[in-house]
Amino acid sequence: SMIEMLGVLAIVGVLSAGAIAEFGKAVFRWKAIKCTEEYNLFISEMLVYEKDWIKMMSKQGSGHLYIGPYMEEWGMLPSSWTVSGNRFSDRLGNHIVPFVRNDLMSFSFNRRVDIDFVLSQRKGKETAEFCRLVFHNVIIPNCDRIFAIRVAEKRNDSWNNGSGWYMGCQYCRDSRNCIERINAADIESLCNVCSEEKQACNILTLF
């Protein structure tokens, strides 16, 4: 592929510093697009068993039911992901934590399958760029499947309230913030919390 060919040229010193920088951007973009493709596949696999996850949560009671170990055991993960306890890591080092919750005050948010996408903060602007790509390639195309999403950042070991909730297409009512109404400027604003090297930022997604 073109990426592999440029990589060889970079290693042998044929490319200039500027070309190497552009190569780095191209590699990141390629990996980022691959990640979003894997996210979409993962979501589809996960939602096949949505009713089963919710039944398991009902038997457990309150708290969180982490479904990652089951998905790993059943071979539902992309081959490029690594596993650490209840969370997965993609090829860019972002963490994916799938679970069912039963601990929010609003009952309508409980007993839903969630994915917490915790984005790597080491890359600053690259993380914000990836956040925007997740919105364009994952969140918006899955609007009909999603109940709600929000973006938040972690400072001093605690998560803030973030952006507030944006409702999925089937739950967009009246004056609510809705995914189907999000434009490019909104995405830019939402993903700005990921642009600095803070502890973490996440896109919490409820289905």
What is each model feature region?
Residues 1-27:
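N-terminal single-pass transmembrane signal-anchor helix
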Residues 21-57:
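Membrane-proximal N-terminal amphipathic helix
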Residues 46-84:
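Short, glycine/small-hydrophobic-rich surface segments
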Residues 78-207:
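Intrinsically disordered, low-complexity regions enriched in Pro/Ser/Thr/Gly and acidic residues
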